[in-house]
Amino acid sequence: MQRLSPGEFKTLISKERKSHFITPFALVYKTFCDLGYDQKNSDYFLNNPSEYIIAMRKNCWKEFEPFEKEFTTRMLSYLIDEERIKDMSPYDAIRDFTMEYPTHIYDLALSNTQSRRSRAGKEFESILELLMMGAGIPVDVQGAIGKSFFQKNQIGKLVDLVMPGVVQYTSNKRNTMLISAKTTLRERWQEVPEEVNRTGIREMYLATLDDSFSEETINILYEANVVVVTTIENKNFKYKNNNRVLTFEDMLQSAMELSRKWNNVSYTDSEKEEIQRSILKQIEKYSDFPYVVNYYRNRLSALFD
């Protein structure tokens, strides 16, 4: 067997990872349907967003974990030289393997960690996206429309969701909601107020599952017109007396109130065309996911009623 160099193994990890794992959105969508959320009405999502988010996060991890174990086993098996170890005891074979491939093992573990972090963020965005859809709240998604379209309309790259949409944001910022999703804040929270100042965004909701951000961080974000949003459990346990921290329940009620303000708005022909293009692009992006397609088709029908 030809020995793989660390560089060759890294390349193989990257190649195999792309083909082995389903996309974060596909995993979230599968979990969403497996848990029966596709059968829930809008009242459930409006009244129980924290419960939904916690359950989805937990079950997405349960769904993902076997994929990662299988992937790790498969990647390590590429390094096994059966001829070399055939006369060794199990102990000696394991010892020889770890001494022979410490860099390879480290690189695989590091790749798994980095992939987990990246996927966790994308999964959280997708969980919020399906939450808004379930609640019947119109929303445009950067992941479906593209960063360039968001940035062209002076919406920063850190914004993941726009309610009710990008076109509405450009015509009346006051009655729209911008949401940025971050599972944890760490030091990256500083990017958010910088983005708000740079783009002239009026206000941004920062949705997070983090429960370790300080009062100082909350105040800095608040002064920059960034509203921290977390689960009702985090709020009650860590920030009960801080009115500058909202719950997902609060955010959805605000989103619903804002969305109603667009019910009787008369759009220009060019605005309608832009909204239609945006919706059709998202239908194309999610063509394999019936629940999502149905949501966007309903939005399209409402546009021309």
UniProtKB/Swiss-Prot annotation:
Name the enzyme's class.
hydrolase
One term of GO molecular function: type II site-specific deoxyribonuclease activity
Reaction catalysed by this chain?
Answer: Endonucleolytic cleavage of DNA to give specific double-stranded fragments with terminal 5'-phosphates
UniProtKB keywords: Endonuclease, Hydrolase, Nuclease, Plasmid, Restriction system
Q: Name one GO biological process term.
A: DNA restriction-modification system
Enzyme Commission (EC) number: 3.1.21.4
Tell me which Pfam families the record gives: EcoRII-C (PF09019)
Q: Under which name does UniProt file this protein?
A: Type II restriction enzyme SsoII
- Tell me what organism the protein belongs to: Shigella sonnei
In the UniProt record, the gene name given for this protein reads ssoIIR
